[in-house]
């Protein structure tokens, strides 16, 4: 059985399919009521499953009529998505952000589960045992070297 975060994620992805557009607007209160959860659960799903690294942009307006607008970043091909990720990574990247990059590659079918697990192991803090600043820089360099390889092979 899936946990609530998985269920909410699938619901939002289904909204994209049904809308046949690259933009979906949802209301926190409506989703929370629909799934009988607290709005912070929805915030968690948005912040972890619909990130830039996953290929989405988020716009949020709080308050009574507040909404969350999720826009799918349109990359017609793998090269566009890889270039988008390369721009996002910058000089350093945290382990969690690195995992989001890997999840995005997996979601787009650019890598398989086995490759994702191998890349996660390579960029894991237990593999890169050094101070945080150096580790985040090395992690970014590893990902920036891997992404073009994923794109061309």
Curated annotation (Swiss-Prot):
InterPro entries: CtsR (IPR008463), CtsR_C (IPR041473), CtsR_C_sf (IPR041908), CtsR_N (IPR040465), CtsR_N_sf (IPR041902). It comes from the Bacteria. Keywords: DNA-binding, Repressor, Stress response, Transcription, Transcription regulation. The keyword Repressor applies. One of its GO terms (molecular function) is DNA binding. GO terms for biological process: regulation of DNA-templated transcription. Negative regulator of clpC, clpB and clpP transcription by binding directly and specifically to their promoter region. Belongs to the CtsR family. This is Transcriptional regulator CtsR. It comes from Staphylococcus epidermidis (strain ATCC 35984 / DSM 28319 / BCRC 17069 / CCUG 31568 / BM 3577 / RP62A). The gene is ctsR.
